[in-house]
A protein has these predicted regions:
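N-terminal targeting signals for export/organelle localization
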Residues: 1-59, 191-194
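Active-site-proximal beta-strand/loop segments in catalytic clefts of secreted hydrolases
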Residues: 81-83, 112-115, 137-138, 168-170
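A short beta-strand-turn-helix
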Residues: 53-77
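Hydrophobic beta-strand anchors of alpha/beta hydrolase catalytic cores
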Residues: 78-79, 109, 155
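Sec-exported extracytoplasmic/periplasmic mature domains
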Residues: 70-74, 91, 98-105, 126-133, ...
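Structural microenvironment flanking redox-active thiols in thiol-disulfide oxidoreductases
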Residues: 90-128, 138-145
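Short pre-active-site segment immediately N-terminal to redox-active cysteine/selenocysteine motifs
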Residues: 75-77, 82-85, 151
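Thiol/disulfide oxidoreductase modules built on the thioredoxin-like
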Residues: 124-131, 138-193
Length: 194
């Protein structure tokens, strides 16, 4: 190769390497749309009903939300309060995708979209799909009912009796912290240190 040919080859190799690295990690960013059907097949009927409403934005406000919580008695529940304009929410969604696929046969997951237009909320869910529905909460009625009245994200944990046992206000700094809280508050397990 000539000197110019070598420079071109090195330049193209560098561009290919950099371009390949741009999509290497999906942790904390909208990654490929996962297929949850296999992981969640055989879920108990109340949880299967949630999975059939995967990634949908539901109306009905606090009354519909409370009715859903009541219908899930017998299962621990994790509720993530999010908004399309929230950067930390976008960071947490891939972790919620993984956790809901991993534990979705034993734990109910729900979302609450706070103060969004329907179009923005649906666009967000289109880029970061989850195997559970989210309730639209434009007036913050649901947020007030669970005490999530500040910023977003917030994550609420209910026990099997439908009682709110913990509300994490604000974002999780690391995916491992969110996983540990799901294991602690939803499953009653302590995270083992590695």
């Amino acid at each position: 190769l000539t000197k110019e040919g070598r420079k071109l080859a090195v330049g193209l190799a560098l561009v290919a390497l950099l371009a390949g690295g741009c999509g290497a990690s999906t942790e904390g960013a909208g990654g490929p749309h996962p297929d949850y059907a296999k992981a969640l097949a055989g879920s108990p009927p109340p949880l299967s009903a949630l999975h059939r409403q995967a990634n949908r934005l539901l109306e009905g406000g606090a009354e519909a939300y409370e009715s859903r919580i009541a219908s899930l008695r017998g299962y621990p529940i994790v509720v993530n309060v999010w908004a399309s304009w929230c950067g930390p929410c976008r960071f947490e969604f891939p972790t919620l995708q993984k956790l809901s696929a991993a534990y979705g046969k034993r734990v109910a997951f729900l979302g609450v979209d706070k103060q969004d237009s329907e179009a923005h909320a649906r666009a967000f869910l289109g880029s970061d799909p989850v195997p559970y529905p989210s309730y639209s909460d434009p007036n913050q009625d649901i947020g007030r009912a669970i005490g999530a009245t500040g910023g977003v994200p917030d994550t609420a944990f209910y026990d099997r009796a439908g009682k709110l046992v913990y509300l994490k206000m604000g974002p999780y700094a690391k995916p491992a912290e969110l996983r540990a809280d799901v294991r602690r508050y939803a499953l009653g397990e302590e995270e083992r240190s590695e």
